[in-house]
């Protein structure tokens, strides 16, 4: 499927969410598909993702991010580092607007064309719980600390922690979205940090290993 068949894509998203035991409202489903449509439109010019087929985008981007959202329950200030096209941050924000209404999601990337896309998504989808920042995370003076810092396909764990550790609040944690369990990366975590949990994820219709890595001070 290369054409943007909205009913078919919606059906796959709804079925996948059911497989994740997630209940999405009609408004959330509409916004997720609207986000996908924007990604398809902008991708042809801005090269946001190597995935070109909207059907594959539902599984590899939307459902892959939705599989992780429950791990963020209770978080108030979340930072998505190297946000790129908005994964998992935009998906998390769409979910949180109803599921975790006090959550705020900040997206940071160094590439202006990517943050321009994210700013457009925020505006078109009316995501009041999202802020977008163009900066290098290691040099960024954020207006506040974050209780959760996340990333997907951003960097090795030691770099992720070293570059953004100054932005993590006391008692906060990193949640990294990874493919195969990164045992070597875990072994090379810098001093002062420890892995609290490595959690396998099952993403409907995705035949690939996915893991969440929870890192805290210790």
From Swiss-Prot:
GO terms for molecular function: rRNA (guanine-N7-)-methyltransferase activity. It is found in: Cytoplasm. The keyword Methyltransferase applies. GO terms for cellular component: cytosol. It is an enzyme of class 2 (transferase). S-adenosyl-L-methionine binds at residues 82, 87, 137-138, 152. Its EC number is 2.1.1.170. It catalyses: guanosine(527) in 16S rRNA + S-adenosyl-L-methionine = N(7)-methylguanosine(527) in 16S rRNA + S-adenosyl-L-homocysteine. Keywords: Cytoplasm, Methyltransferase, rRNA processing, S-adenosyl-L-methionine, Transferase. Specifically methylates the N7 position of guanine in position 527 of 16S rRNA. Belongs to the methyltransferase superfamily. RNA methyltransferase RsmG family. This is Ribosomal RNA small subunit methyltransferase G. It comes from Herminiimonas arsenicoxydans. The lineage of its organism: Bacteria, Pseudomonadati, Pseudomonadota, Betaproteobacteria, Burkholderiales.
